[in-house]
Amino acid sequence: MICVGIDVAKDKHDCFILSSEGEILADVFTIQNNAEGFDTLLQTIRRYTRPEVKIKVGLEATGHYSYNILGFLLDKGLPTYVINPLHTNLYRKSLSLRKTKTDRVDARTIAAMLMSDVDLKSYTDTAYHNEELKSLTRYRFDKVRERAKLKQSVSRLVTILFPELEKLVPSLHLASVYALLSEFPSAKQVAGAHLTHLKAVLSDASKGRYGRDMAATLRDAARRSVGSIMPAKSLELKHTIRLIRELDAEIEDIETAIQAIMDEMQSPITTIPGMGVRMGAVILAEIGDFSRFDSPDKILAYAGMSPSTYQSGQLSLSGAYSHMEKRGSRYLRYALYNATKYVCHWDPTFAAYLAKKRAEGKHYNVALSHAAKKLIRLIYAMEKSQQSYRNAA
């Protein structure tokens, strides 16, 4: 067996090749982070291998810097291990008391870790899907948050330009309202619109739900409006609505990509009543490989949902007086709480559990956190057994 250690950087990678007998086959050499460099690495590896020789390639998880070299290695069919830098650091310290930290040392350390057969798992298709899913779900999270801020801006601008509008429609954030405000971004412009044209705009955007009566109601309200006449704010409103529409389209594209990966993964998580694809995808993406966790409690700690304990001298606060740690993955914590709300609504077992906790006098959010813990234990069991909800429950 040969072990290849790669220390990844932005522009270049340091590599080291070691045999299972401890022989240095290729002392630390540097390749550029480009096609020529990747080919050099591949040819060097092949120089020391035969069909019967097992290969292990290891590199540190360095975020986006490792994506391209990792993809290349996987495409060439080389078993690749992505190692947490913390583990590399601890392993290096266990080998030497000297505080040496260079790329050359790291390349050797990674190869030595592979040779020592410490508990490492090779990068798999599942890991690839999880990484893709994490990128997509976090990207969607950011886009949705960006859209929410823009919607707040719309509400603020409507309060200035046409404050009566909000009481005449179920929500300002309807396609019909956006269509109206895109063409008539102030009460004055709505008041001066031809009724037939106003009706056509509303009818087309609402798919016939709003017609002449709504158009007349809005125009009458606009003519009595106390809204300000501020062309700059009207322009800002039009541009803000356009940005929201663009974000709507982008989010839809992201959700399509998420759905495609979820279809390929075929996780049983979406068989839980109330567990949608979007929240299920975030949970799977943030947890990643379930085999990394010995128990559901480890996942709860990773999500920052374990109760914290304060201890000073003889004083120890825990149990009823403890608070959630709120460390770990905020994305996972967000998804678990939101998914739990829906699961408690749609599933009788979880609904009864939430009601039981509320009957014990617990605040709604505290009761919900208990239900979230119950949910993560269920998900853990389902992912381990690959059974659907009804079989796992």
Q: Can you describe what each PLM-predicted range is?
A:
Residues M1-A393:
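A detector of single, family-specific signature residues
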